[in-house]
Amino acid sequence: MLEPPAAVVAYLDAQRRGSPPDRACTKAAVKAVLAELERRAPGRSVELRVPPYAAIQLIAGTAHRRGTPPALVQLAAPDLIDLAVGSLLWADGLADGRVRASGERSDLSGYLPLFDPAVQFPS
């Protein structure tokens, strides 16, 4: 597993210190997570939405071009980052409604977590 990118570490560090990460920090962390997901699961069959920050298409299969995608995953930024570092499991996110997924290939559990959860923070 990879070490988390600096943007994800900054986001987690802000949370650890008890201050909510600002919008720019959150956006940078979301973009870093999505970039790694795109790298690991290239394709256009699933749309992953993290409003209001970004949406990407990933996983090989039937390409989505217009309208409602055949497979859709939507979640909030904190939940995406928690999935990426392993502090939220895919099944738990689905069960409690933090992750909304529908359609063929929308199960992203095989790609998560992305990063080593043992993040080392500066003192």
Report each predicted region and the residues it spans.
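Feature captures hydrophobic
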Residues: 1-123
